[in-house]
């Protein structure tokens, strides 16, 4: 389902643990890590799509999390042509996303990467809030930056420092009411001061 400009409606999920670290999922059979995300189906609200994707990709139910905040407007990114199927070129332009910030109220053991027969991740870990900005594939980096920046003030931890943000980055954003979503490539070792847990494999 595309809007008139060729963007597919989508939701992104930033899931926090009690230490305000973020869930970071390793895409199945790749070396890429990213936040959970997925398309909004016809007739779904962004919140309904978020809870569906949360269960499909992470195995969590609504009673395992609490919604802290969401982005005010759609955040858009365009996908380069070489990432788009040939039959979709000229029609599909990219993704427009509403991002949700969630607090995990359950336990790590509640997560299940094989909740469906089409898993997205085969491992996961907890990561410092800002570190993912440095390991996101370039064409999605602006949206990650904007979502993390907009939602950072709601994170229940003092003294956030956006030391990884780059100047000059911009993402397309529109009011939610206007007319009118994958591949991430980690680039190497993370900052020595960053909080990173050991990857947990899917069982």
UniProtKB/Swiss-Prot annotation:
Domain of life: Bacteria
Compositional bias of kind Basic and acidic residues: 173-185
Sequence segments annotated as region (Disordered): 170-203
GO molecular function, one term: mRNA 5'-diphosphatase activity
All copies of domain Nudix hydrolase, residue ranges: 6-149
Gene3D superfamilies documented for this protein: Nucleoside Triphosphate Pyrophosphohydrolase
Cofactor(s) this protein requires: a divalent metal cation
UniProt motif (Nudix box) ranges: 38-59
Keywords: Hydrolase
Gene Ontology terms describing biological process: mRNA catabolic process
GO terms under cellular component: cytoplasm
Family the entry assigns: Belongs to the Nudix hydrolase family. RppH subfamily.
NCBIfam families in the cross-refs: PRK00714.1-2, PRK00714.1-4, PRK00714.1-5
Function: Accelerates the degradation of transcripts by removing pyrophosphate from the 5'-end of triphosphorylated RNA, leading to a more labile monophosphorylated state that can stimulate subsequent ribonuclease cleavage.
Protein name as it appears in the record: RNA pyrophosphohydrolase
Gene coding for it: rppH
